[in-house]
Amino acid sequence: MVKSFFVTGTDTDVGKTLVARTLLLEFAAHGLRCAGYKPISAGCARTPDGLRNLDAVLLQEAASLPLPYDLVNPYAYEPPIAPHIAASEARDAITLKGLSDGLRQIEQAGAELVVVEGAGGWFLPLDRKHLLSDWVKQENMPVIMVVGAKLGCLNHALLTFAAIRNNNLPVAGWVINRLHGSMSHYQENLDTLRGLLPAPFLGEIPFVNNPLEADLRGRLDISPLL
């Protein structure tokens, strides 16, 4: 049976891709045929090969199972706006079935484990009726929560955690990502979250100047996920 994890964040730009990429590298190092799935992206660049999203490319490259880009990122839009608005402007629709069909194709391609990266935060609209979290619930995927370390992260983390649990989904673990070189009372914030979040703490991502180029293997404890 193929195992999948959904990576969400407490906000936009808190390090979901960094964590998803690091997880893929760790799983690959353990000999697993792992794949990345970034089903929805906006802010894509035009290339000779079509629209490309840097986050999706990084997941594609980190995975041990080679897959074509269109399988990794089926819903790709150029404007850097909310994906459902970008889809509407492109006369497209992001559907629950389309998201599931994409995941099934990756499973059928031979993946043993799939790291699925969300877009935005937990409650990302797909249209005026559905949220990306509806799909995660439909797939009954365990969730990995990325906490961006900044002022307000305690509230953001607790709200996101509560929302995930209210969807009756398990939180497989959580990661804190240092967004800045210095944060007042960082350790106290981390200690508070470790006391309040009843889920495995997978580790800390340090602040680095070029995070998407950094090799952060060894920073995360994936044993609770295996």
Swiss-Prot record:
Catalytic activity: (7R,8S)-7,8-diammoniononanoate + CO2 + ATP = (4R,5S)-dethiobiotin + ADP + phosphate + 3 H(+)
Positions annotated to bind ATP: 13-18, 55, 117-120, 177-178, 206-208, 213
Main location: cytoplasm
A Pfam entry, by short name: AAA_26
Molecular functions (GO terms): ATP binding; dethiobiotin synthase activity; magnesium ion binding
Entry keywords, A to Z: ATP-binding, Biotin biosynthesis, Cytoplasm, Ligase, Magnesium, Metal-binding, Nucleotide-binding
Biological pathway: Cofactor biosynthesis; biotin biosynthesis; biotin from 7,8-diaminononanoate: step 1/2
Subcellular location: Cytoplasm
Group of enzyme by EC: ligase
Record's keyword annotation contains Magnesium: yes
Gene3D superfamilies: P-loop containing nucleotide triphosphate hydrolases
Keyword Magnesium included in the entry's annotation: yes
Cofactor(s) in the UniProt record: Mg(2+)
Binding site for Mg(2+): T17, D55, E117
Any one GO cellular component localisation term in the record: cytosol
Task of the protein: Catalyzes a mechanistically unusual reaction, the ATP-dependent insertion of CO2 between the N7 and N8 nitrogen atoms of 7,8-diaminopelargonic acid (DAPA, also called 7,8-diammoniononanoate) to form a ureido ring.
Name by which UniProt lists this protein: ATP-dependent dethiobiotin synthetase BioD
Species for this entry: Aeromonas hydrophila subsp. hydrophila (strain ATCC 7966 / DSM 30187 / BCRC 13018 / CCUG 14551 / JCM 1027 / KCTC 2358 / NCIMB 9240 / NCTC 8049)
Gene expressing this chain: bioD
